[in-house]
């Protein structure tokens, strides 16, 4: 047990040497081989990500309120004062931490699926970019691992480019969780935040937007290749106003890691899901993976399915301060064609058939 704890403490600290030294001792334990230990660390790393994003914000909020009623109330008061002072930081570039992005735990999470990043074209550090990420999936494993961490080596694959993954602005109102997100270079998905990154933060910025958003996650399931894009034109308008190039990104396998009960449009359950999604900001999906101890059972652990994120060819976009609707529609159509081409060119390499098509909703 001490060996297990020593290995995982190395994961959290980002110390590869402590992990290896702990693992070298594993052959002395007859029931735990090195390969099994690595697999356990991968599962723990994935669960750490899931539980952090599902519970950290709420748990820290409750803890802060509880501390107000204890002898530690001063800590709560000081943090709330800091929160008020620092309220606008997430929308002004945040506080990226190279140390957090380089944590070894993210590499174990990467290897669980595994997750890969594929470059098709070079990106110029003298330009700014908006990456359109598709599909949303249930928990956006590919988006977070590729753009919220250095597990797949984004800054080495695209030298001079700094990614900023955009997520719900409400997440940055939650104590401590906001600090955690900012360390990964994650920003609010609102106009002010994106405008700041593309206009007041120099060049070489890549804002990653999951275009389909929470609504798209309601249709994510194995074997489905569909994205919500037809009416999503706000990101194109942002790109035109800032002169940022558009880059389509498709993650093959993102929809394969969880199974979901999908209700038909117009049904009573789907109506409830849509209303809750608009009220809460995220979609209440009924999904499951495999169990922690018994793979054939249901649980939160995602299925081990490869996720391959392909970054497509950038579409050069001029800077137009007040783009007309016709211009927005034109570049939106160009983006859709580019995304379809990206999907068709790579689908057979990553588990799909030649007959599979990308459905645009």
From Swiss-Prot:
Q: Which residues lie on this side of the membrane: Cytoplasmic?
A: 1-42, 86-361
GO-annotated molecular function: diacylglycerol O-acyltransferase activity; retinol O-fatty-acyltransferase activity
Q: Quote the subcellular location field of this record.
A: Endoplasmic reticulum membrane; Lipid droplet; Cytoplasm, Perinuclear region
Which CDD domains does the entry mention?
LPLAT_MGAT-like
Query: Could you list which ranges are Lumenal topological domains?
Result: 62-65
What family does the database annotate?
Belongs to the diacylglycerol acyltransferase family.
Q: Protein name, please? A: Diacylglycerol O-acyltransferase 2
Show the taxonomic lineage.
Eukaryota, Metazoa, Chordata, Craniata, Vertebrata
